[in-house]
Each structure stands twice: as C-alpha cells, then as structure tokens.
C-alpha cells in the first residue's frame, strides 16, 4: 500500500512515464530480505521499453517496506547474477550489510537517472559528504574528509575532476529535457574494501547511456564510508570516455585527511 504517499506516487509515475515498463509474463518468484531500513521485495520481473532507440530491457523491480508493511520506496534493481556475486562477496568478507547498502544506493541512483531526477544527481555530486540511506540523499556539512593523491602522471588533478563533475550535470540536465528516451546501463560494477581502513569502500562503474539522439560512456568512482552513524559518500568522480586503466581514479588514490 502506498496510495497515500506522495513521494512514492510521484516516483512510480515518472518511472512509468520515462521507461514505459510492464510486468513480465509468468510467475513472480520474488525474494523478501531484511535491509538497513526495513524490508525489501526483490526480483519482480518487468520489461522497460524505449521506442526511439528500438530497445527493450529486462529489469527487476525492488519494493522497500517499513516494519509496518507499508511501501516507502521503489527502484529498478540490478540484475540477479550481479546481485548474487555481491551477496557471495559479502558473506565471504562478513560485510554483506555494508555491501547491501551500496547496492541499494546504486539502484536508487540508476532509478533517479531513469526517472530524470536531476535534483538527486545534483545532491550526489555535491562537494559535501552525502548520507546515502533514506529515500532522498541528504547533504552534510563535512568537506575534504579524504585527501586525493595522484598515483601517476596520467591521472587527473583535482580541478579537472571538479570540471568533469560540473559538465556531467549540465549534460544530464540537457538530456533530461530534450530526449524522448534515455537508457542507463553498466559494463562493469565493482565494490572494493579499503585495506587497513575499516568500513571504507570504493565503488567503480563503467557507465553508458543511450538516448534518442546521443550516447556516451565513462567511468564513475564513489568512496563510501560507514564509520559515521549513517553511511556517507565523500568522494565522487566522473571520467568521460576514459579507457586507459592507469588514468582511472581508484580507492588507493584516497586517504583520510588527518
């Protein structure tokens, strides 16, 4: 039940408007899992349709419930094989709770993109740390918690990183306004734990999008810290059309600013 929740109503309306999804035929074999904030119903099979780029994509929908059984959020989920890999890594490293929060954040981020929610993208790429649990991202007053160090001369400097973030947001705002269809996917998606620093993770994704008249690809890196009361993102970088592995920003580029 979510009929009296304006947030969920607005979100599912935009998900449907921009992705024209339909529930897939056949039996629904969904999973119910405990989460950081409540419960989730995972693996509802749907199909998204993007007519102007001649694309149909199989997707999973994830419903989030509070402890009283009320739906408080809805997102497109990552595919089952990738999700299973992250569960296995979390069980092996005894940190599935942290990895689950990261997975669910990525699902919220991708859903915001596919729903053309520029406000959430603006929050994600803010200079301040951002709390990533909850239905919306919340900025904090914390800045410069981590220090960036280039590992080689092929990696970008801080000014270039800021420029590419700003350009990325400008491009997305234009795309969201001008394109009939937009699809966002990932060619790679990795979660890494920082050595010798508890509860700090790097998230790297090779992200691509197709739209009615334009397509692009790039490398997105996020640093997530679980050492505060609520998990936060401190670092985010976007490297458009970067293929050189030596130039990619990694978790090893960052250390606590002491």
Feature names for model-found ranges:
Residues 7, 11, 97, 101-104, ...:
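Extracytoplasmic/secreted proteins, especially bacterial periplasmic and envelope-associated proteins
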Residues 1, 90, 103, 140-156:
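Acidic/histidine-rich, surface-exposed loop or edge segments in extracytoplasmic proteins
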Residues 7-64, 145-216:
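Surface-exposed, charged secondary-structure patches
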Residues 75-85, 208-211, 235-251:
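Short, solvent-exposed aromatic-acidic interface loops
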Residues 57-71, 216-233:
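A short, surface-exposed beta-strand/turn
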Residues 69-115, 123:
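Short, low-complexity N-terminal intrinsically disordered segments enriched in polar/charged residues
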Residues 110-114, 126, 130, 173-181:
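Sec-exported extracytoplasmic/periplasmic mature domains
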